[in-house]
Amino acid sequence: MKKLFISFMALLCTLGAFAQSTAENINQPKAMKPIIMVVPEKAWCINQGFVKDGDPKSPDYEKALLNNDVLNVITKMGGIMQERGYPLKNLQSALDELKNESAMDLALVSKADGEIVEDEFDQLTRVAQTDILVNIAFTRTTYGPRNMVEFRVTSIDAATSKQIGGETGRSSASGAPISALLEESVLGFIDNFTGSIQRHFEDLVANGREGSVIFKIANDCPLTFDSEVNLNGDTGELNEVIDYWMNEHTVNGSFTQNGKTRNRLSYEQVRFPLFGKGKFGGKPKAINMDGFIKPITQFLSQFGLSVSTTPVGIGKAYVVLGGK
């Protein structure tokens, strides 16, 4: 009887430990995954003739998506990424959203002024608010009724345009649709490909997204970046005060000042958090560089300055200082 009681108690302990382990696994948050957008590779679009009218060096993604093979390949690659848990931003939806963005007409200065220029690709990544771009290119070789297709995919950080990873694959010669040939080629390397993306994104979560900021002095600004100002009882130059703000707000104080004149101040390798505080006590929300740097406008107003910010893509922003 005593042995039976001991065995029963041991069973209860085992079941309790299993239940606790199961509850912990259920409550454990899932790993965050970056938002992906699949796009045809820029060089591939140009080589295939999918370019803007009158500008043979600028890809036209709208034209590319009118091609059935391109559309099928992008749709299939997006589906493969979604199956692995990656949120997907649709390229066509982003293009449509960009066309409907009326604020773009007011935000930027023309190239002739030598000021802030945002090309269409920067506009696209800003509107899409995607973390990673998956560029895809393919070459079809025909053998009678059969096709063999070579694919090239690269992952790009949307904020910096730096390559994260890249893979190539080749299908067997087959009469199957191009989407099936893509799947055959990609499945051999997809784990390595998505693994490099996930490692990069986990670094962004831990150490911040990388970007750049350029400060400029407007004609009506009463100060230059060499002007002396007072802050917290200390005296220093305006550029030093901006350095102070950057050090206080970047992730781990990570940034590099890579250029300074009286009227221009630039920073690279600026690590800013993926999420910022929501207004009015709201939930944290995903931010781009413009969202990160915008609070400096209030900080600089104490020196009699009016400050405006303009985003370029998701990883770059211009900050213009003027007089009140």
Can you say where each PLM-predicted feature lies in the sequence?
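Solvent-exposed coil/turn segments that connect beta secondary-structure elements
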Residues: 41-44, 93-94, 139-141, 154-159, ...
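Amphipathic beta-strand/beta-sheet edge segments enriched in Tyr/Trp
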Residues: 131-175, 318-323
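Bacterial Sec-dependent N-terminal signal peptides
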Residues: 1-23
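Envelope-exposed proteins and targeting segments
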Residues: 32-34, 84, 129-134, 147-152, ...
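C-terminal basic regulatory modules in eukaryotic proteins
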Residues: 291-324
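Short, flexible helix-coil linker/hinge segments at the edges of structured domains or between repeats
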Residues: 94-112, 156-178
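C-terminal/domain-edge helix-coil "capping" segments
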Residues: 20-35, 40-48, 162-254, 313
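N-terminal segment of the mature soluble domain
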Residues: 50-127, 133, 236-275, 281-302
